[in-house]
């Protein structure tokens, strides 16, 4: 792919569902090799924004470019990994078969073992997904998103149901991937995870209220804790 400055370049994106404006003029630019966190409560617009980046949601207004290409564009998806909030897996297949399926789509079945080992599922690779716990299904879904070693990784609440020890391991891996050039956009409402990001975007009512490093956001709000900064900076009406 080309080497543009931004892996994600979305401008003035608007998305309406009936009378509800899920995205209200969002502009988002994420540099290559950056870990960017979307922080906000449920219903803030995080999932809709991520789905618009991958081309699953068509905005009413605005533009979305990913890896230098205007979305939606099928060829770009070969370079994008996307993990949904709810595991999109085949319940009657094993964990290994699920990851192999997604690897085959991208012609990267050689990455199956690495992906399963990363999420600590190699020992359970023969287990049918329907028999796995919710946390294990989350990990399997993440392995499917990682199997083809994407240039851009879009993660919607990737550590829900994951135990604290594995959460730390996953974030260590995310940081290593970013150091190797992978761009990661991750949504979360967990403050300690937000602290691991290079930059954050605080989102509520479909608006991107503030952006910057954790230190910059705290300074902008004039507080010492990220939770307090989010509460102070999100004191806006939905109108």
Question: How would you label these PLM feature ranges?
Answer:
Residues 54:
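Helix-to-loop junction immediately C-terminal to a conserved catalytic motif
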């Amino acid at each position: 792919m080309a080497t543009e400055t931004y892996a994600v370049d979305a401008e003035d994106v608007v998305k309406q569902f009936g009378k509800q404006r899920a995205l209200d003029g969002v502009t988002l630019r994420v540099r290559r090799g950056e870990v960017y966190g979307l922080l906000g409560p449920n219903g803030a617009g995080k999932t809709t924004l991520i789905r618009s980046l991958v081309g699953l949601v068509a905005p009413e207004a605005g533009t979305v470019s990913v890896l230098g290409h205007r979305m939606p564009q099928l060829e770009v998806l070969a370079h994008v990994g996307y993990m949904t909030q709810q595991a999109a897996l085949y319940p009657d297949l094993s964990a290994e078969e699920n990851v192999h399926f997604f690897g085959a789509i991208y012609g990267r079945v050689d990455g199956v073992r690495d992906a399963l080992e990363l999420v600590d599922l190699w020992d359970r690779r023969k287990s049918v997904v329907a028999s796995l716990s919710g946390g294990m299904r989350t990990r399997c879904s993440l392995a499917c998103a990682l199997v083809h070693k994407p240039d851009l990784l879009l993660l919607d609440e990737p550590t829900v149901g994951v135990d604290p020890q594995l959460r730390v391991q996953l974030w260590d891996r995310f940081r290593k991937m970013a150091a190797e050039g992978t761009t990661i956009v991750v949504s979360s409402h967990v403050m300690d995870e937000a602290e691991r990001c290079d930059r954050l975007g605080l989102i509520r009512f479909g608006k991107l209220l503030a952006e910057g490093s954790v230190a910059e956001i705290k300074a902008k709000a004039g507080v010492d804790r990220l939770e307090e900064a989010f509460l102070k900076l999100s004191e806006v009406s939905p109108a």
